[in-house]
Amino acid sequence: MTAKLPYDKTDPKSIERYAKKLIGKTFQDVLNESIYSNSKVGDESGKYCDEKRKGGLGNLLEKYYFGYEVNSDSEPDFKEAGVELKVSPYEEKNKGGYKAGERLVLTMINFNKEVEQDFYKSHVWEKCKLMLLIYYFRDKAIKNNLDYHIDYAKLFEIPEKDMNIIINDYKIIIDKILQGKAHEISEGDTMYLGACTKGATAAKSLVSQRYNENVKAKSRAFCLKNSYMTTVLNNYLMADECTDAAEFASEKELEAKSISEIIQDRLNKYINWNEDRIASKLGLDINKKNKSYEAIIVKHMLGVNELEDEKIDEFQKAGINVKVVKFKKHGKPNENMRLEDINFINLDKEPFDDEIKDEEGNDIGWEASRLYEILGNRKYLFAVFWEDEEGATFKGCQLWAMPDDDLEKVKAAWKELKIKIRNGVEFEVNGNIVTNNLTKSSENGIFHVRPHAKNSFYKFTDGTEIGNGNISDTDLLPSGDRITRQAYWLNQSYINSQLEDTLIRHH
């Protein structure tokens, strides 16, 4: 690789200008046009075209477009310019729009080394202070990775407001390491900066930790979370300038407190207030028959007018969703919590865990699934109300993320569900009653699948129709049968097991 570099390696803008020439090209184009390849293009193509391996494309650009050897040290890729190259996929969402295809891995965490407590002296900062983001579209119809199109190339500096949150995230992670609790780290601990598991099978890639010789921990890396990178993708790379979302907290507030603390401060002052009193205090005139009545009240309690979580800047970046948990009066338990309706055709098309891989060759089919996006990539702000004779009283809130061990149980249930759908859902008909073999609440203790439709209706491939609804109440199965529209639900008992005791109504 002795060819002269077609960019100034000391100038970030020069590197960016050269990178922008990639836009519209495929990775095969890069290989075909490379001035650095000393071997036959066919030989090089074979290394990167495995349809299961979604990684390696960043290495291809490093070597055959930018002309430098791949490095894995803590220095930036373009060290003379202080620029880190990050090549990553984006995908189309099932419901339209686009999302980051993966979290953005920054650097491995070495649990055996002394921890750097100053974020600005850490390897993480070296890897993220100035990044050249190159995004390609992961088109599921394309089988050869080299045929993916590169669509975006842009320098990115993390905004100062976000840095306050990231520094707090860093502190949360290193505090656990210093306490000898690296084995207890979870991505759910933090907002924007995560500590994701690494290794072909994370459960087998256990490493020792300096601060606790008795317990091994899963190998992990610092990363920018999928929810954060999805926001960067949509509001920065895909937009001429950053799209404004509703602001939850000011930069000054975030310098003094974490998002979690600000949420608690804003909501806790309403504890033991009746919902009517809260609405009156906030000047709200909302029809109580509105199914989103409490959710609207909670948003105003938080100081935002947006009902949609993804339109609140910090909630969008941290993947926070507000959910109202209501304990019924007269000794009735709170309800199961609906997460999202299921599209069975899309679920069937989702790859199994070992059918998709990241840059390092790790299985990520599960992490690319819709159910993981709902439960693994999100935090939930539970706003708890207790019903009484006069309506409902606010009892407090809890910011929650599903523990890693529970996500593993959900992963196993997701795999079983996909197998059932692929083999054909089994139905048992008894008059107008139709039962199926989809996930039951007793099977994993966390979630289940059950109907979410106004009316029940089934239409089977033999022409049989059962129920008092119509086609609009159904979803199509890969077999051709139509089933009453189904949804993922969190079990009521599981929600109770995760809530703080002061929020639970004991009977």
Per-segment meaning from a language model:
Residues 1-79, 87-507:
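Nucleic-acid endonuclease domains
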